[in-house]
């Protein structure tokens, strides 16, 4: 009976939405191809190791009997992990439980939900705009967006706000339908969203509330009561968590203050700096803001309310995200589907041009960043001729270097195709391969970067970068990151002195690994992401203890 019902429904779906026959396979290729080629990089390794503790203890912890992870965010004596909300960790732990502790298992749930995001965006756009061609193009933009694809392929929570934003706003806009509104979908999704990434949820739900207040007369009065009920139930299942994790709000700023003048967390200008950082990144990779005025042209007045919703939610998300210590683009991931809709709306409904022109513009937006950074090239030339303007402090120098590096013509979509079709191998991949042959679980090993990832793959007792003592005598010492020159250059830091003392007191053989001495395997930050396997004349050095 169930099969008889599903069969015709699936056939009707395929007939009515033929573009999905292209979009779904395309999304699968872009997300899944080469998914497990590279080892888990530093942030992936840390989160995945936290997830693996769930398999041992039932709850996420900072430590197990092998190593500890993210000690900078530890606030409870029992080591219970409360730095972030738990749903992504239980999601990943389920995959590890079923498939084992592999790279593929660590990334699989996030990749699956990435493809689901594309499908959800198609139907959400169709519901919102009521145009199949706009729904198709918005979805195409999202699954051709390299930052989004990298997030979907990352073993972390960073891509989940994309899906949850779509589901949350979809459940919200049904309140304006001419039928009885059920508050349960938005309630359940809100609770899940909060316990996935509460800062992103706060931004989107704030936008929803603002939009609802502005358009409250467009829905039935009975829905006010139902919306209030949804808010109360959501609060019951979310607000206690903020009380539970309150100590973390003091702990994390302390960690960043220790970083010196690299990060501004106290000056009155920090919010403006963060705002400029978010706008710069979104403009360069997601939505070229030179097109923003087109949203207010006459041909798009029919979609005034829909545009308003997307802009309000994007703005509120950015406003809340300004509270973060660093303006990472990942905090704006929830805006990606909304900006994709606006971009598709401009091209399909806003421009009265021939279809060939639309296709050319679409291809330009996907394959190049010409429209994104073109208006900034003249500014870059001016800055390049006046570098002294940015020499006052480290922050200004860093901002200048980022601007000069990022404002140039790029073809990141093409580079992504190269990455997924050619196995990426970074320094950590070579290190893991070396120890799977030469090391064994239980060996003690000091490594100056990505210790969680190494422990995840090898089962070795890995010593954290800053925890090495002069009295330690690890079986292995790997220098490839922050302290790779600690021995030869006679660095004065305590860690460098401890390493030199260990090598002086104990016999070690020196091995030079044919891998570049780079501190991280890769990163999901599009501005720093490597698409091809790196090379360097500076090689990783491994010391093996020889007195046994």
Labelled PLM ranges:
Residues 9-18, 122, 127-128, 132-133, ...:
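Membrane-interface helix-loop-helix junctions at transmembrane boundaries of multi-pass membrane enzymes
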Residues 52-53, 192-196, 201-302, 318, ...:
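Transmembrane-lumen/periplasm boundary regions of multi-pass, lipid-linked membrane glycan transferases
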Residues 151-152, 161, 202, 288-292, ...:
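Hydrophobic/aromatic-rich transmembrane helices and adjacent perimembrane loops
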Residues 127-132, 166-186:
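Membrane-interface transmembrane helices that cradle and orient dolichyl/undecaprenyl
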Residues 346-347, 369, 473-548:
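Aromatic/acidic, Gly/Pro-rich catalytic loop(s) in extracytoplasmic/lumenal soluble domains
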Residues 21, 108-129, 167:
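Transmembrane-helix motifs of polytopic, lipid-linked glycan transferases
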Residues 231-235, 347-399:
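Signature aromatic-anchored transmembrane alpha helix within multi-pass, membrane-resident enzymes
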Residues 397-480:
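Short periplasmic/luminal acceptor-recognition loop of GT-C membrane glycosyltransferases, typified by
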């Amino acid at each position: 009976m169930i099969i008889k019902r599903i069969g015709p429904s699936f056939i009707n779906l395929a007939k009515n939405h033929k573009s999905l026959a292209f979009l779904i396979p395309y999304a699968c290729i872009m997300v899944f191809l080469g998914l497990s080629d590279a080892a888990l990089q530093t942030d992936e390794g840390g989160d995945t190791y936290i997830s693996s503790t769930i398999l041992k203890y039932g709850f996420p912890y900072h430590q197990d009997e092998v190593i500890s992870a993210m000690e900078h965010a530890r606030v409870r004596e029992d080591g219970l992990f409360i730095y972030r909300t738990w749903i992504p960790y239980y999601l990943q732990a389920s995959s590890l439980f079923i498939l084992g502790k592999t790279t593929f298992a660590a990334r699989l749930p996030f990749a699956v939900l990435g493809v689901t995001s594309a499908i959800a965006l198609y139907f959400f756009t169709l519901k919102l705009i009521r145009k199949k061609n706009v729904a198709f193009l918005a979805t195409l933009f999202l699954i051709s967006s390299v930052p989004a694809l990298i997030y979907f392929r990352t073993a972390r929570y960073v891509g989940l706000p994309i899906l949850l934003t779509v589901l949350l706003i979809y459940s919200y806009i049904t309140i304006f339908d001419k039928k009885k509104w059920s508050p349960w979908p938005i309630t359940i999704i809100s609770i899940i969203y909060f316990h996935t990434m509460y800062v992103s949820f706060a931004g989107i739900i704030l936008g929803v509330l603002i939009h609802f207040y502005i358009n409250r007369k467009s829905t039935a009065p009975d829905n006010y009561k139902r919306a209030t009920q949804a808010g109360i139930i959501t609060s019951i299942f979310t607000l206690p968590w903020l009380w539970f994790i309150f100590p973390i709000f003091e702990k994390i700023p302390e960690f960043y203050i220790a970083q010196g003048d690299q990060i501004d967390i106290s000056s009155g200008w920090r919010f403006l700096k963060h705002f400029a950082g978010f706008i710069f990144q979104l403009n360069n990779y997601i939505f070229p803001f030179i097109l923003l005025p087109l949203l207010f042209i006459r041909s798009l007045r029919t979609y005034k309310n829909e545009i308003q919703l997307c802009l309000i939610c994007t703005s509120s998300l950015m406003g809340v995200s300004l509270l973060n210590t660093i303006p990472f683009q990942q905090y704006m991931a929830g805006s990606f589907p909304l900006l994709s809709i606006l971009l598709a709306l401009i091209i399909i409904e806003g421009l009265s041009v021939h279809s060939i022109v639309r296709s050319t513009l679409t291809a330009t937006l996907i394959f190049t960043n010409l429209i994104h950074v073109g208006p900034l090239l003249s500014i870059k030339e001016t800055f390049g001729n006046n570098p002294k303007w940015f020499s006052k402090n480290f922050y200004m120098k860093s901002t200048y270097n980022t601007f000069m590096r990022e404002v140039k013509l790029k073809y990141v979509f093409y580079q992504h195709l190269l990455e997924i079709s050619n196995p990426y191998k970074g320094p950590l991949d070579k290190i893991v391969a070396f120890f799977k042959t030469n090391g064994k679980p239980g060996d003690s090993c000091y490594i100056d970067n990505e210790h969680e990832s190494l422990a995840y793959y090898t089962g070795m007792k890995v010593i954290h970068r800053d925890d090495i003592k002069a009295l330690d005598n690890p079986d292995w010492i790997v220098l490839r990151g922050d302290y790779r020159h600690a021995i030869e250059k006679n660095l004065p830091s305590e860690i460098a002195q401890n390493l030199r003392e260990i090598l002086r007191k104990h016999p070690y053989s020196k091995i030079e690994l044919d891998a570049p001495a780079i501190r991280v395997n890769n990163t999901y930050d599009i501005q720093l992401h490597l698409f091809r396997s790196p090379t360097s004349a500076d090689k990783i050095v491994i010391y093996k203890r020889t007195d046994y």
